[in-house]
């Protein structure tokens, strides 16, 4: 038999050192192996595959997939999610100058009395800018407006024989008349939302005008309405500031089609506008619609029995 070399005392001490260093690691390994892994009763009793497989004869039909399909993401859901993720970031507030821009747009347009004079685009700066007369004129100049009046495209097609084919000409006339009727409808809706104003800032009411009840922000009807305060004209420094008016004067998107009262114009704005149109011609923003109110019967006839 071969002689087995005996371990010296130096080798034994080195082995004992290695075993001492491995002890904490071995304890950690044994502790992890011994700790039971939490499993549900279904996982312990049944073998659940990681990926679901569809067997032939049991494939999901279209109406089954509807139950698994997530509902569509609407605008309201996206707003709620955005508010949850970023609660500090609210919607941007409208600025002070935004109201001035809206109020100026409600006033009638001003044109020079002589049509051959080019239109100066700085005319609206006189309402909000103190030193507007020192500003240079816009380059290039805006040409004067054209007033067509009754000479519209419909009268041009009807009078001039530009279209030889009678059938084609009739189609163009019918389509143009249909577009003009649609324009009248849109004009009537615009008058309900923002009625035209005169040079004094007063509303030009149509015949048989009826004042509507005020609808509050919460959707409640107020009999006398809320007296809105006019927005003062800001200077050049305050144009970009948030609106100082804390009343619920700016309608929400939900009530954009509701008949809300408009904010009255500022007295300073009307005064500057009247001084501006001394040598100019003021025309309404859009011509008043020719739509007439529906005729109401004077008295309803009593129906006799058997009368249809």
From Swiss-Prot:
Tissues/organs with expression: Expressed in Testis.
Give the signal sequence positions.
Answer: none
Give the InterPro entries listed for this entry.
DUF4532
Question: Can you say what this protein is called?
Answer: Testis-expressed protein 52
Q: Which organism is it from?
A: Mus musculus (Mouse)
Q: Which gene encodes it?
A: Tex52
């Amino acid at each position: 038999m071969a002689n087995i070399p005996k371990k010296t005392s130096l080798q034994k001490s080195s082995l004992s050192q290695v075993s001492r260093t491995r002890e904490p690691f071995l304890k950690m390994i044994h502790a992890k192996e011994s700790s039971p892994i939490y499993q549900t009763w279904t996982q312990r009793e049944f073998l659940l595959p990681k990926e679901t497989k569809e067997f032939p004869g049991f494939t999901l039909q279209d109406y089954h997939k509807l139950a698994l399909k997530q509902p569509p993401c609407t605008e309201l859901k996206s707003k709620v999610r955005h508010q949850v993720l970023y609660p500090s970031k609210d919607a941007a507030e409208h600025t002070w100058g935004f109201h001035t821009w809206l109020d100026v747009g409600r006033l009638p347009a001003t044109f020079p009395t002589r049509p051959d004079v080019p239109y100066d685009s700085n005319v609206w700066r006189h309402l909000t800018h103190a030193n507007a007369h020192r500003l240079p004129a816009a380059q290039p100049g805006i040409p004067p407006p054209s007033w067509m009046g009754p000479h519209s495209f419909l009268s041009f097609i009807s009078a001039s024989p530009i279209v030889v084919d009678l059938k084609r000409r009739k189609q163009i006339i019918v389509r143009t008349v249909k577009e003009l009727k649609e324009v009248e409808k849109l004009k009537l809706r615009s008058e309900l939302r923002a009625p035209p104003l005169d040079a004094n800032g007063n509303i030009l009411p149509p015949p048989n005008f009826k004042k509507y009840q005020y609808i509050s922000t919460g959707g409640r009807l107020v009999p006398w309405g809320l007296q809105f305060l006019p927005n003062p004209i800001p200077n050049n420094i305050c144009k970009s500031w948030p609106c100082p008016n804390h009343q619920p004067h700016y309608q929400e998107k939900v009530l954009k089609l509701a008949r809300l009262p408009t904010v009255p114009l500022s007295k300073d704005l009307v005064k500057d506008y009247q001084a501006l149109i001394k040598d100019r011609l003021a025309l309404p923003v859009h011509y008043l619609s020719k739509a007439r109110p529906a005729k109401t019967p004077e008295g309803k006839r009593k129906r006799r029995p058997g009368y249809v």
